[in-house]
A protein has these predicted regions:
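A polyanion-binding, active-site-adjacent surface
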Residues: 2, 14-136
Length: 136
């Protein structure tokens, strides 16, 4: 699993030393070893990698990662560029942005540009088993 290396580390590093975190880390490692889990392990903390704490302007909180191939990559509501279908939850966000603010609706669901602009795209759960919603 990719480690956090920016200013988020100072803010949350104390959690990494606590017993619950060590147990959780071990559990997640075992899940990755025995089954398919999304996002890929190196992408789990992408929300923190792409949006440093000092750059956060707004939080867009999702529930859990998408659970199918070529979707989850560590940013809530975002899918990888090769995924041509925009998930319904993101379609709803795009529709609201268009209806309320007149924003352009992109033809893809890759939101890294939002993250780079200070939108923290974080799920309340960072990993999910393939094809199973709400698994852990």
């Amino acid at each position: 699993m990719g480690m956090i290396t920016n200013d988020w580390l100072d803010a949350i590093s104390g959690e990494f030393k606590k017993p619950y975190y060590r147990e959780l880390y071990q559990f997640v490692r075992e899940e990755y070893a025995r089954t398919t889990v999304y996002p890929p392990a190196d992408d789990i903390f992408n929300a923190f990698h792409f949006t440093p704490l000092s750059k956060v302007k707004v939080l867009l909180l999702g529930q859990d990662p998408y659970h199918n191939v070529n979707q989850a990559h560590g940013l809530s509501f975002s899918v990888l560029p090769e995924q041509r279908e925009i998930p319904p939850s993101l379609q709803n966000i795009y529709k609201e942005l268009h209806d309320d603010l007149g924003c352009y609706i992109p033809n893809n669901g890759y939101l890294k540009k939002w993250a780079d602009q200070g939108v923290l795209l974080l799920n309340t759960v960072l990993t999910v088993r393939r094809s199973e919603e709400h698994t852990f």
